[in-house]
């Protein structure tokens, strides 16, 4: 395990840190934690987030590890990790078009045609076109291959019909990278294609989903004979499952080391709550806080072990998805976060249940509520355990329904 990023990555860190000091508006930093129902901050439709995206692009801080031929910096995975670490350390907003920057862009770089790269990568980097992800459906979450959305070829267009759910930022997205069944006669994993569907058309209806957190960045999306050009299939017809696994791998591996950084800061806030309520001498509280710090230290070790393995193998942006490491890390941090936010709410006592005017929750209340979803999105903990069991421990694959498991 190597904790040394090397001279080039550390120079990038210093340069980016100085740039953040000069360009990160203090008001934007304050808005990162603003979760008032009347002024939700979770959504790039906010002009200040789009302005933040523009500044990053103009300074060359978009597409850090994208190849230079596609408009990126052509830097290594280490610089990409440093970029995310410094954003967290500075309390900076997320990149507004993050679904396209961290998931779709790299997927197109790996699987897309030359025409698709020419058409879509530039607007993604420049923040001219915003994207949402259309994978999950009401009856297809962890069992994603059971999706029911269909696409039928009509001349030079695909006609898409079906429903997606939990679609982040669909309410302002220009396009959706969507999984649809293009061969209903094929086996579940073989008849799916990865489509790029325009959102601004009569056949698309978006309905926001208001959450207990007070935000509504998630949506239901209804495709009613929506249309997409025939050339908008990424990775080849009926090969969408392989393409989607690449995208999900980027989702799990896009922030290799930032989870433990943000959770350490969150834990420091929980300690201050305990201190303010005179609970630090309580042996049970001390035990739980010590356990939390230990788990964050384990998270850090796991992150650096993953990063060391990737860099030792010469991994770049297109290789970060492989192996069991992202699944192991995702399972650990998501379950930790549910546990530690429970602890934080318990330490706050009755005050933890009180909200401000307009349903304005505190950052710790928001974390507690949102953490309920973290063992589900991006692959449930059960799915991650299957991956770790099969790829790391060499256990037999989970039997399919109706399969004879007798030995």
Name each region found by the language model.
Residues 2, 78, 82-83, 103, ...:
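Glycine-rich phosphate/cofactor-binding loops in nucleotide/flavin-utilizing enzymes
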Residues 1-96, 119, 123-126, 276, ...:
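Amphipathic, small/basic residue-rich leader segments at the start of a protein or domain
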Residues 49-128, 168-175, 296, 310-323, ...:
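Internal helix-loop-helix
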Residues 3, 7, 204-301, 374:
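Glycine-rich beta->alpha junctions and the first turn(s) of the following alpha-helix
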Residues 140, 165-170, 212-213, 373-380:
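Glycine-rich phosphate/pyrophosphate-binding beta-alpha loops
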Residues 28-38, 275, 279-286, 297-358:
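C-terminal helix-coil-helix/basic helical segment that borders enzyme active sites and/or dimer interfaces
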Residues 127-135, 179:
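A short, Trp-centered hydrophobic/proline-enriched beta-strand micro-motif
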């Amino acid at each position: 395990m190597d904790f040394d990023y090397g001279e080039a990555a550390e120079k990038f860190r210093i340069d980016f840190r100085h740039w953040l000091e000069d360009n990160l508006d203090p008001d934007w930093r304050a808005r990162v934690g603003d979760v008032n129902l009347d002024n939700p901050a979770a959504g790039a439709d906010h002009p200040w987030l789009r302005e933040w995206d523009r500044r990053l692009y103009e300074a060359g801080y978009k597409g850090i590890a994208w190849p230079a031929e596609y408009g990126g910096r052509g830097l290594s995975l280490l610089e990409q990790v440093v970029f995310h670490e410094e954003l967290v350390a500075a309390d900076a907003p997320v990149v507004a078009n993050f679904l396209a920057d961290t998931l779709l862009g790299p997927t197109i770089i790996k699987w897309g045609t030359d025409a698709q790269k020419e058409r879509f990568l530039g607007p993604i980097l420049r923040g001219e076109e915003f994207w949402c992800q259309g994978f999950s459906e009401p009856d297809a979450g962890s069992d994603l291959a059971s999706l029911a959305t269909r696409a039928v070829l009509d001349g030079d267009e695909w006609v898409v019909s079906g429903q997606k759910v939990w679609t982040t930022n669909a309410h302002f997205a220009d396009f959706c990278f969507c999984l649809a069944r293009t061969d209903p006669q094929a086996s579940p994993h073989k008849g799916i294609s990865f489509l790029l569907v325009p959102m601004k058309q009569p056949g698309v209806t978006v309905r926001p989903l208001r959450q207990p957190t007070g935000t509504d960045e998630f949506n239901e999306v209804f495709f009613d004979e929506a249309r997409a050009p025939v050339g908008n299939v990424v990775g080849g017809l009926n090969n969408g499952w392989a393409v989607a696994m690449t995208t999900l791998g980027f989702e799990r591996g896009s922030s290799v080391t930032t989870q433990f950084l943000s959770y350490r800061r969150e834990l420091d806030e929980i300690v201050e709550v305990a201190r303010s309520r005179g609970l630090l001498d309580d042996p049970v509280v001390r035990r739980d806080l010590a356990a939390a710090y230990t788990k964050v230290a384990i998270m850090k070790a796991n992150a650096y072990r993953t990063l060391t393995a990737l860099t030792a193998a010469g991994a770049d942006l297109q290789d970060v998805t492989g192996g069991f490491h992202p699944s192991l890390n995702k399972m650990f941090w998501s379950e930790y976060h549910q546990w530690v936010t429970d602890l934080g709410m318990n330490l706050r006592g009755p005050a933890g249940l009180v909200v401000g005017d307009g349903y304005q929750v505190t950052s710790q209340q928001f974390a507690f509520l949102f953490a309920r979803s973290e063992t589900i999105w991006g692959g449930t903990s059960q799915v991650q355990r299957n991956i770790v069991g099969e790829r790391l421990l060499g256990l037999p694959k989970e039997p399919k329904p109706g399969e004879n498991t007798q030995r």
